[in-house]
Amino acid sequence: LGKLQKAISCFQKAIEIQSNHAGAYNNLGNVFRELEESKKAIGYYEKAIQINPNHAGAYNNLGNALKDLGEHKKAISCYEKAIQINPNHSGAYNNLGNVFRELEESKKALGYYEKAIQINPNHTYAYNNLGNVFKDLGEHKKAISYFQKTNSIVSKEELLKYSYLLDGLEDYKKKLEKFVEKETCNRNVAAMAAYVSKKENIKNIYPFCKDPLNFVSIKNLKNVLTLTDNFSKNLLKRLETVHSIWEPKTTTTKGGYQTLINLFNTTDIEILKLQKIIEKQIIIYRKVYERSEDYFIKKWPHKCKFSAWYVKLLKQGHQKPHMHAQGWLSGVFYIKVPKLLNKYEGSIKFLLSSYDFPEDKNLPNLIHSPNDFDLVLFPSSLIHQTIPFNSQDRRHSIAFDLIPK
């Protein structure tokens, strides 16, 4: 955070010296977007464009910030404007592909990714994105061929997954051994390794978090911290003023609303109070597991940042199985949950699985039916989901990740 604040000061000084410095405004936008303050970033990108209407980079960056906020149509217009100014802007073509993939328009996405590669044959992201689209379409041989074209962590994750699904256990074990030599804390691979080791009854050699279900912590904070119903009312009142989106395309939320900005980038008293509570509980959590040899605990990052979001689920609302690959530790604080539900309705379910792997009902899982003021902490490599519920009441929660810097 210190370096980013210094960068902000430098760019502001540049503008103080030269008020029409479009590049400085664009760079300020980049810093605020990195700080997950996309609304602020948008203002700076727009100022850069106002000064220099031919600033293709600012249009591309503005598109990214708008996409962060779920403004897909506006983002598309910005990327198209960037390309109009600079027809060889491979990044804008790649970003157009990302938008159309989110909108589930795979054919359009393919065309834009291919164009990005045509302009820049070394565009790693575009190759990975092409692989992901073909994977979405079930064209696995094509997906593999694109993942093989790069040496990125993402492509290695996908090829490791395919080795188990298509080539069998022995090939997977060889590839995992090679992966461990270079990367020991990849959350996607940790999820995969935990699943395969249990399913195949073999030793889990991936050191990040070998048995993640053992690291789920559930604590009700109402009595521990004398939280009151007034606290939750004030918190909900504040959260209702934050812009949220129905079933955002980039999330697993179905039948509900979710915010896309980082809630913890705020000066709001109630939200900051909750953040401080969570920080203290994480210290306690680490103390509980301090003797673990798993790298999840042993190699806990020295510098982290929070990312938090609010989820409001309605009747039949749920979240599909997912994990938080960018996080280290993840969690949920339940503000207010529906009452009188049937067994497991509205519960959070933890399971040993990985993206693209089918759930194996013979493998262990953990289901928790939350109460108001419950705090649940767990490794970010652990797949989880919310089970649908039938109540007319709303289910209010704040989810968060602790992310290594």
Language model: regions and residue ranges:
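Canonical positions in the second alpha-helix
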Residues: 14, 48, 82, 116, ...
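Conserved alpha-helical positions within TPR/SEL1-like repeat arrays
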Residues: 23-34, 57-68, 91-102, 125-136, ...
